Amino acid sequence: IYVNYSSNAQQPGVEQLRNELNYQNPLSLSGGNPDLKQSNMHSVYIGYTAAKTEKSRTFSLNFNGSVTAREIATKQVFFTEDTPLPEYNGYIAPKGATLTTPVNVNGAGSMRLGAGYSLPVKALDITFSANAGCAYSRRPTYIGDELNYTNSLSPNLSLSLIGNKSLVYQFSLYTNTAYNRTSNSRKSDNNTINQTVATNLTVNIVKKIYVTANYNYSLYHNFSYADGDVNTHILNLTFG
């Protein structure tokens, strides 16, 4: 069992802390925030691995997560009329201008749980492996002057077969399926799925002459669109 904890602090930049307004472009203003605090991220990782060397079997389980306090985000305010800014010596922001400033936000975090298993199938001279995981993240951001929280959930599963029959043939088969669901405070959802399949086969026809075939397939589907599928097929053959 392996356990690790770490902490990281991010200090605001000097420009971010200056109580000054950049008005070189009167319609695109930017200013500092002297009340900005440093952000602190706390991370933890826990891993477990078990192996049976006599049977060449392995099992692993891991978890990692992090939370961030006072993350530094960018806030943007749009002015619908001429507006004085007392925090910047009373400068009057003209109608139609935007003001961009850094601010601290809370609520950022992420976590992931994963597991893996591998074992040989001696009767077929192949090794089977499976890996599964699920990740979740929550990220606060500003859309204009409105604080928005984006949540993302991403489970995935991958399987593989690897075979090696001495000098006769070598082959591998790999497949991965990943689903992603993203939602935010504005009730807009986005759901996608990615599927990939990759296979490789090398056969020794006669002495020192080999045929190698590689096939790759990928599928991307966006559930938000009726015609959101993207399919790709690639086949390569080599002789040597």
What is the predicted role of each segment?
Residues I1-G240:
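Exposed, low-structure sequence patches enriched in small/polar residues
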